Amino acid sequence: PFAGVTSYLGTTGADPIEEIKTCIRAADQVSEEDPEGAQLLGVHLEGPFINPVYKGMQKEECCLLPDVTVMEDLYNTFKNKKLCRHMTIAPERPGADAVLRFCQEHQIQTAVGHSAATFEEIKKMRAYGLGGFTHTFSGMKGFHHRELGTAGAALYFDDMICEFAKQTGMTVSHEAFELAYRIKGSSRIVLTTDCCGLAQTQSCFDHYVRKIRFVKDGDQVCLEHYDGKKEWIDPRDYQAVKQVEMSYAQSVNN
């Protein structure tokens, strides 16, 4: 493709259960129709079993305690069960162990996100198949030298993948990302994108939520922050980006 991605996981949020089911049915329909363009590999359930303390932009009233009955209901909504590929969960919340066991038994990948989990809680729950971290450092308990927290666990466990969303330096500083990259390496870091705005546009794009303007500047992209700060991104050195992109494709296809 000229822009965007070759494949993706359709992602739900912490929404009312019926809205999540509507998204699942839509994913089934897209999978059956197999339209031209990027391939739908499956669905990522980013909630509803997340911690409201770290809800981020999710709906607090829809952040539910992990409930295996609700999980079974969501899973059974899928006509094509193979589309239920990935779930983000707060493993410290009561009931998470049963949901994680269910996911493990049904080959559903799980990741820590929107979570206040301690290092020890994640260490314990790894036995239930936790494989990574969703938008690492954002929406999770931070690092302390006496209690590593969720962020520290993300760096510590070599076999767990750290996903970073839209790494522009806005939600995670460049230095924090570089620190993670030094520790984890390209094979254990993945980048995801919502690919909005700038793709194939000939003019600037205003991201009103992030308060930033994306402007094409020759072969580069200029990020003009509303506070006056400017940054330039040179996409020509694609090899380093390709390494982390492919690690994501491989992770969801395993």
Show the residue positions of the predicted features:
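Acidic (Asp/Glu)-rich catalytic clusters
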Residues: 2, 31-35, 75-81, 126-128
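Short beta->alpha connector loops
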Residues: 90-95, 114-118, 168-171
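Surface-exposed amphipathic alpha-helices with a cationic face
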Residues: 28-31, 100-107, 181
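Divalent metal-dependent hydrolysis catalytic cores, especially in the metallo-beta-lactamase
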Residues: 1-23, 38-51, 80-92, 108-110, ...
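Conserved phosphate-binding/catalytic loop of the ribokinase/pfkB sugar-kinase fold
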Residues: 51-76
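N-terminal active-site wall of soluble small-molecule enzyme domains
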Residues: 72-75, 93-102
